[in-house]
Amino acid sequence: MSAVPMGATVPRGEAEVGKPVNRGYWERYELTSQFEGAERIAKQWDLSREELDAFGKLSQDRAIRAWEEDRFGSQVLTVDAPDLGEDGTLADTTHNVSRDEGLRETNLEALAGLRTNMPEGVHTAGTSSQISDGAAAVLLMTKEKADELGVKPMATIVDSCLVGSDPVLMLTGPIYATQKLLDDNGLTMDDIDVVEINEAFASVVLAWEKELQPDMETVNP
C-alpha cells in the first residue's frame, strides 16, 4: 500500500491518478471514500469514539499477543524489502522484514489523544487500517488432488457467496455475507468457533457485531 497513490499520499498539484468514474455512478451516488463510509457506519449504528478506541486497543493487544506466542512462526517468510529515499524513490539498499510493521503497544489514554481522521469524526489512526505492505499466498486444490498428492488440507472451503451493499456505506458487506452464509447452511454464530472479519475500520467490525451478536472472544482472536 505504501507505493500505491492514495488521497493521503498524492502531493497536491500532481497529475490526477486512477481511472475516470463511470458517468452512471455520478448520476445516482456521490463519489465518496472508505473514510467517509466508516464514519457513516459509526453514525448509523450509533458507535461512539470510546467504543472504537476500546476495540482499537483490543485489536493491537491481540495482534501483539499472537506474535509473542509465535502463532505465525511456521507461516511467515522473511523478505528483504527495498528502502525508499526521502523523495519516495527506490534506493540501492534493502532492509529485513520479518513481522508486521503496524503493531503498537497502546492504551486508552493515548488513543483518546489522537486526532480524528475527519472533522467531527470518531475514527483515528488507532482505529483505522494502516498504510503498510504485506503479501500472502494460499495453495488451493480439490480434495481429489490433495488425495492424489498425499497432502493434508489445513482447511476446507464449505461455501462462499456474493452480496451487494450500499456503495456509499460500502463497508457493510461482511454483515450481509455472514447472514447469507449462515442462512444458506442452516447455521448460527454459535456454530462458528473462530471468525475472521477484516478490520478496515473499527466501526466495520462493531457494526457487524451489533447485527450478528457473536461471542467476540471468537472474533479475530
Identify what each model region corresponds to.
Residues 39, 75-82, 158-221:
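Active-site pocket-lining segment
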Residues 51-148, 211-218:
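N-terminal extracellular/periplasmic Venus flytrap/periplasmic-binding protein-like
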Residues 1-41:
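Flexible glycine-/small-residue-enriched beta->alpha junction loops
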Residues 15-23, 116-124, 156-163, 217-221:
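Glycine/charged-rich beta-loop-alpha catalytic/anionic-binding loops adjacent to active sites
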Residues 25-33, 46, 50-56, 120-137, ...:
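Active-site pocket-shaping loop/turn-to-helix segments
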Residues 36-40, 44, 58-65, 110-113, ...:
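Alpha-helical scaffold segments in soluble metabolic enzymes
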Residues 144-156, 187-189:
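Phosphate-handling active-site elements
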